[in-house]
Amino acid sequence: MNKKSMITVNTEINAPIETIWKLWNEPKDIQQWNNINADWHTPVVQNDLRSGGRFLYTMGKADGSLSFNFTGKYDVVTKHELIAYTLDSGRTATITFSQGYPVLLTETFEPDDKPSVEEQRDFCRAIINSFKNYVESKLV
């Protein structure tokens, strides 16, 4: 695979880093926020959050017309700061969490060949926004 320019998506989240970290990594919470809209869901999540640990998210349309597994291995996990992983396809990604308030969550990933870079960016942005909304709704 040819190396492509990385895609970066970020958002500021108005919550303490401890809350953000927990909700980003707990399987029961991931199932709630890991979607692009109400037509999507993540019914299966396995998350062994440690360097060398593996993850599996089964994502798809809620009507069952489409699903896929998002799987890989954690390369680096630094609590409250960084998650770096390699997907089973060989693509890499990092997620950083700034210190302070609000927290800036930044996800940078190597795009796949399909769909388009714009579609992949929009998909990631929708999931990040879903996470932000989920976290901030928990604090109300």
Residue ranges of model-derived segments:
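Hydrophobic pocket/interface hotspot
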Residues: 20-23, 30, 55-57, 74, ...
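Short, highly charged C-terminal tails/helix-capping segments
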Residues: 134-140
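Beta-strand/loop substructures that line and gate deep hydrophobic ligand-binding cavities in soluble
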Residues: 82-126, 130-131
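A short, structured loop/turn motif at beta-sheet edges
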Residues: 16-18, 49-50, 75-80, 96-104
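Glycine-rich portal/gate segments that line the openings of hydrophobic small-molecule binding cavities
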Residues: 41-84
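Hydrophobic ligand-binding cavity/cleft-lining segments
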Residues: 1-40
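Charge-dense, helix-prone N-terminal extensions
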Residues: 3-4, 12, 58, 69, ...
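Short, surface-exposed coil-to-beta transition loops
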Residues: 8, 66-71, 90-94
